[in-house]
Amino acid sequence: MGDFGAAERRILEFMSKGTEFVFNGKGYTVMLSGKPTCHKGEPKTDIYILAESCEDEVEIKISYKKENADFIENKMSAERAELLFGEDWIDIIEQSTTAIQDKFYERMLIYKNGFRRTEKGSITLGWKFELLNKSGGDLSGKMLLTDEQVVDVYAGSNLSPDKKNASVCGQIIRDSGVANYILMDENVHSAQDVIDKMIPIREYVMM
């Protein structure tokens, strides 16, 4: 599908107003679709779709990830950590890093000689905290999160109000920035493909 932005735009083209698809055994028509935006940063939802059937309407809020994407959050700041993990973010990170503290103690702080990609004379000032969906090297470990907390991270449930209640096509829509589905398949060619291949975030976390 090419680059990430182009892939998102292509999915939105599939989901243009008036497009029909079958979801949970019922036929729906797209009433509104767009990419949620906010003043600073980004919501978790990449593609917002409001569709209706003859019986009801449904909000489909997709977080789109490339199949080879490793990072959930790269070079995380304190502000971003609180948004992802909630008010207990310090304890969560502290407990998770303490679980692998021996790995940190084994690392040199001052490099008298070069080592791997570290140059001679380098001094370790600290480490950056990154959240990945798989093991990422010598200093990686499993985050000590409950299933519900993992769902919150993927969905963006703890994000700030402006990111949760994002703007879609000029309209502020409540919780439009909180994703409820994830799509990791780049091989989609129609609206129905998108619907068939997206996975509920809660189900994805439990896989």
Tell where the protein language model's regions lie, with residue ranges.
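Generic hydrophobic/packing signal
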Residues: F4, L12, T29, Y48, ...
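A short, highly charged nucleic-acid-interacting micro-segment common to nuclease
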Residues: M1-K17, T37-K40, Y105
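A short acidic/basic microdomain associated with nuclease active sites
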Residues: K17-S53
